[in-house]
Amino acid sequence: DGLEDFLSHVARQYVINVHTLNHDLLFEQLIETANLQMNFSDGFTEIGSPYYGIYENKEYNVRYHCRLARFTNNYKDKAIRLYKLHGSLNYVLHSRAKESIVLEPDACLKIPLGINYKIILEEIEGKDEYGVYPFAEHPYFLSGTNTKCKMYGDSLIWRRLQENFKQNLRKANCLIIIGYGCKDKVINESIKKNLGNVSKKVYLSPSDQTRNTYA
């Protein structure tokens, strides 16, 4: 309850940029529990998305299409903004053949609970039908030290998230670090180069390594 009250109070006056390296959905669940969805953005939007998943409940004989949110990098007008720099358990990469038989990624989608991420439909413009393309069989997130550093330059989502991170650091009035062990060299460099002359730095439960790196 304390964190929920804190977010609700601070968001009335300030923008809260939350950058996390975790893949779980804990923060999203917190936002839902605290009823803060109207003031929250994770960069994904359903508006204008041509992608659909299928929700099916065999027990109640229910089956219908569900529009999927895609990453648009739009955080405008929301006070609580979530940037998952390493991806998430509910992110998936949509790929399709364009001018060749080689599949090319064209969208990062967010899959709600209950939707089969292996069956993704895409609206065909001007037609009342959908295209079905081979789809990733695993969530879209980064893992492994070397892999993460290489993927940060990918233009589909990772590069944009990293640029957001740097820009937010440059604009920050206060930085709060919780539970970060300083194992990501790219993140460390971004903090050192872009934090600037922030007048107030707050550390909550930092490890010794975190304190030695940034204090």
Question: Model-flagged regions — what are they?
Answer:
Residues 1-2, 58-70, 150-164:
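A Trp-anchored, charged/polar loop motif used as the substrate-binding/catalytic surface
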Residues 9-143:
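Extended, H/D-rich, highly charged conserved domains that either
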Residues 2, 126, 136-137, 176, ...:
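A general marker of short, structured functional hotspots
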